[in-house]
């Protein structure tokens, strides 16, 4: 194939030489991004397409990136990297998992308040062993003024339970002391126990109350 007028026009001569030489071989694109794409990546803000975050997400780490070249059917379930794992339903604060309701500020009590309401209603018709006047007197001495009689009776019940537990523990110490002394079992059923300070002291020590034996003068 001949080209005419190639000496007059250099551009026409170049085009004619290219057509004579045939189609150019395919050249693989360079690995680096074009200048325009790199400029767009620098100009894009974080979190948008082409920004630094998108570049990190595309690159990937761990087993997901190692199997990126495999076919989709051979990959199987890809493990999620620690950095890209989505948080659970609750919020993560300093590595501590919080329930969704607690994260939203909607904290509800676990125990229902219905039994407590019923118990307070029963206190209106209940007369404790300790009179209300005695409990109210000691509350006033401690600087607590209770106008609701149910509160006074509730404190009276707590005091009764505390004294009852101490008395039962002291009785157990007394029985153990009697068993260790070698008394017969037949007589122990009808035996009457008298609690002394020796029985009361170990029982009180379990509750953090240290009682010293009073001095005996002759």
From Swiss-Prot:
Keywords: Acetylation, Methylation, Nucleus, Phosphoprotein, Transcription, Transcription regulation. Monomethylated at Lys-189 by SETD7, leading to increased affinity for RNA polymerase II. Lysine deamination at Lys-189 to form allysine is mediated by LOXL2. Allysine formation by LOXL2 results in release of TAF10 from promoters, leading to inhibition of TFIID-dependent transcription. The keyword Manganese does not apply. The modification Allysine is found at residue 189. Coiled coil: none annotated. Belongs to the TAF10 family. PANTHER family: TRANSCRIPTION INITIATION FACTOR TFIID SUBUNIT 10 (PTHR21242:SF0). This is Transcription initiation factor TFIID subunit 10. It comes from Mus musculus (Mouse).
